[in-house]
Amino acid sequence: MNNIGSSPNKIKCHIWAPNGSSCHTFYINIDEHTEWLEHPLRANGVDIVGIPIIFTSDVGYTTQNDINNTDTIPLHVASDLSIVGYPLGLSVNEHLPIWKNGVIASEPDVKISGLDYFYIDATTKEGMSGSPVFSHEYTTQIIVSPEVHALYQRRQRGELDALQFISSIPPESLNNTIQVKKFKLIGIYSGRVTVGTSMPDIGIVWKLSLIEEMLSSKNLVKSEYPPY
């Protein structure tokens, strides 16, 4: 937490019941006894931590694998993205986050100061540090008719080879399409860039690879700087 201008002493969390019937709120206190995971390059400036949470059987949670959020979305300068968090503490019905949009402002594959992060152009506010950042784009999907689905099942059972399957699909069925927005978790937002005394509305996003490295390193440390 070196060189950080503010330090929270409590984190408010919302967890839904497994059936979605209710939302449970709890707090994680941050003090000199708190332990968290740090990235091995924390001393070099990698500004992310992971706080272990033990879930009981009466709460539900969803992982990236559960929702199959593995779509391949190419990242480029000016690619659209969303930062999902609580700007100035604002929320919907006391627990749902706000989605703020922005664009990638630097080459996403080029390291900055030797570290895996990139800049975004977005109007972010206090309370959004630690927010997940998603890229997104629209893709075209074909709405499959029952007849085509039946052909697909026959192909799965080995009753049709690939050529027979393709030639059996009515051409007009390929015209029934829909636009679907796909999302991909690409990193964690950690704050805004300051140039002298000015703030150019440029934010920092640490890449997902750093989060994976932090979790695999299992570098568990205690809070070196108690909140103030």
Model-assigned labels for residue ranges:
Residues 5-115, 121-122, 126, 130, ...:
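Serine endopeptidase catalytic core focused on the charge-relay Asp
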Residues 1-3:
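Short amphipathic, basic-aromatic surface patches that mediate peripheral association
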Residues 135-228:
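C-terminal subregion of chymotrypsin/trypsin-like serine protease catalytic domains
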